[in-house]
């Protein structure tokens, strides 16, 4: 049986994602698969590629032929280089840098709020102290005028 590693289309119109599957070469594009070894979603930035390397190596080893599209995916993940014994087996897969998790973001916002509260209370205390200082300066000036009378 001639097997191929190819893409099986999933999703809705204009928003397709694919499963990387092992199929008999004579079956329909979306027909019954022998095995599903991964997924490919071109709609995300960067595209999401998840391929089970161990199973891909097995199927390549027993003679399954990848289609051009799957061959490109295997090169990106480094599975093709690993199978052929070439340099660069790590592949060129780009991953999204994980941003700070929700808890860290909440802590950062709370810390910023505390800083703002502290700055505001400091400014209020400073304004109050200035007002008291101004009041004490005015009070002695009035007392000598009262004594003169």
UniProtKB/Swiss-Prot annotation:
Annotated GO CC locations: cytoplasm; small ribosomal subunit
Keyword Magnesium among UniProt keywords: no
Keyword Acetylation assigned: no
Renumbered residue ranges of the record's region Disordered: 115-149
Pfam families cross-referenced by the UniProt entry: Ribosomal_S16
PROSITE patterns documented for this protein: RIBOSOMAL_S16
One term of GO molecular function: structural constituent of ribosome
Composition skew (Basic and acidic residues), residue ranges: 119-131
Biased composition (Acidic residues): 139-149
Any one GO biological process: translation
SUPFAM superfamilies named in the record: Ribosomal protein S16
Family named by the database record: Belongs to the bacterial ribosomal protein bS16 family.
Stated name of the protein: Small ribosomal subunit protein bS16
Native species: Bifidobacterium adolescentis (strain ATCC 15703 / DSM 20083 / NCTC 11814 / E194a)
Gene: rpsP
